[in-house]
Amino acid sequence: MPSVCMPTTYRPASCLSKTYLSSSCQPSNRRPTGCISSSMGTYGLFCEGAFNGNEKETMQVLNDRLANYLEKVRQLEKENAELEGKIQDVYQGQVLTMCPDYQSYFQTIEELQQKVLCTKAENARMIVHIDNAKLAADDFRTKYETELALRQLVEADTNGLRRILDELTLNKADLEAQVESLKEELLCLKRNHEEEVGVLRQQLGDRLNIEVDAAPPVDLTRMLEEMRCQYETMVETNHRDVEEWFNMQMEELNKQVATSSEQLQSYQSDIIDLRRTVNTLEIELQAQHSLRDSLENTLGETEGRFTSQLSQMQCMITNVESQLSDIRCDLERQNQEYKVLLDVKARLECEIDTYRGLLESEDSKLPCNPCSTPSCQPCAPSPGVSRTVCVPHTVCVPCSPCLQTRY
């Protein structure tokens, strides 16, 4: 019966190849003869029932390669676990380092915002107070101007009354001069009358009294006396009326002057008080202006400081986000590498299972008598193989327990 060859394909693990069986290889009743290539990464043919020294070395190399693959898989799994642990530690450390507690900063910002709001409210209250003070100052200024106008009117009235008083004084002096002249004239008339009476008495002397039945003579003395009494009464009445009128006018003027003086003093005291109030309000206004300027400066400094702090925090957040993106990229890359390694592991396990199945199937087909195999016929060419390789006629095939001890 012709011998049937079983071609096998083997490639390095880096190429992620699989071992497969050709469809032309069929099981045989004879002891198999095989052709195995000793070069790595090329096609090898394993024929049933044929083993030589090169084949043993090849099996040893395959065993070593499988052991190296398994060791490499375990090492890669170990390194992968270590890398995952390191990544987790670094991620947790960076999260703890790059995400500090900003609650204190937020609390400080809220407190400063409350202070700013309170300061704004205080500024508004101060502005309202200043406006009220300005309105009060305007009212006081209006009152002052009104009182000043009244004072000027009162002073004008007082000056007019003083002119009237001067005129009355002049009229009084004229009337007194007239009274004196009338008194002198009356005295002159009296002296003249007495002189005339004396002259008439001297002229009559011892003359006889001739009584004539006629109308009674006019008593000039009595008439003059009556006229004098009338004039004196008129003069006294006029003098008394003038004095009363003058006294009344003087009393009224004195009252007006006293009232005006009191009002003037009260106005002067009010003006002094208003000036003091205006000075106090101006001082308070300047103090409020300085306080407002200082508060505005403090507010500007606070806003600038917190703006810089917020910009720094924003830069920190940007850096943290960039680091997180880098970490995510690293994690994705390592995840891809891990998936590739898992794929390599799965392929290696599949390849190992294939080798194990091949070895077990060959072990079940090979007999335990090592040197009882006759010479085999030349191998027929198989599909998919470019050339036919023949093995020697006498081959010593190891038994199944020997192969199992190797693997």
UniProtKB/Swiss-Prot annotation:
Cuticle of the hair shaft. Residues 363-407 are annotated as: Tail. Gene3D superfamilies: 1.20.5.170, Single helix bin, Vasodilator-stimulated phosphoprotein. It comes from the Eukaryota. Residues 219-362 are annotated as: Coil 2. Residues 1-55 are annotated as: Head. Keywords: Coiled coil, Intermediate filament, Keratin. It holds the Pfam family Filament. InterPro entries: IF_conserved, IF_rod_dom, Keratin_I. Residues 56-90 are annotated as: Coil 1A. The keyword Metal-binding does not apply. Residues 91-101 are annotated as: Linker 1. The record marks 304 as: Stutter. GO terms for cellular component: intermediate filament. There are two types of hair/microfibrillar keratin, I (acidic) and II (neutral to basic). Belongs to the intermediate filament family. This is Keratin, type I cuticular Ha2.
